[in-house]
Amino acid sequence: MECIMQGDAKVIDYLNKALRHELTAINQYWLHYRFLDNWGLRDMAKVWRKESIEEMEHADKLTERILFFDGFPNMQVLDPLRIGQNVKEIIECDLAAEMSARALYQEAAGYCNGAKDYVTRDLFEKLMSDEEHHIDFLETQLDLIGRIGLELYTQKHVGGLEGEGH
């Protein structure tokens, strides 16, 4: 007889909401990475590409947890992408997405704690910690732009030109 772990329906709902956030973030960071690379801001683009991949790893962990509970990972619904049209807007859009994700993960971790689902709580707390690092990074970038100006900030991130076949 096979034992299937059934999860609290609200926990699975939180996991799917988190999955939606992460899937949206994958696409948003990837598109922003492509914009930055296209604008010649290759050093900055590398960071955004790495963030997109990290969001994919988050989505994978959430999917794994949903399946553990014999739930259905909903990958068909995304939130609207927040797309920046310039460097500062990209940072602001990504910061808004990260703040939204952090709030969801904080709420979800609290619910999971009350439901005595400590493993899922720990997953949400780990995701929240990662998002807080992203938030700190993005806020620092906006602070730099405010202090040194957008022109100097973008000049700092032009890189990868030597030997590039672009």
Predicted regions and their residues:
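Iron-associated oxidoreductase/ferritin-like identity signal
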Residues: 1-166
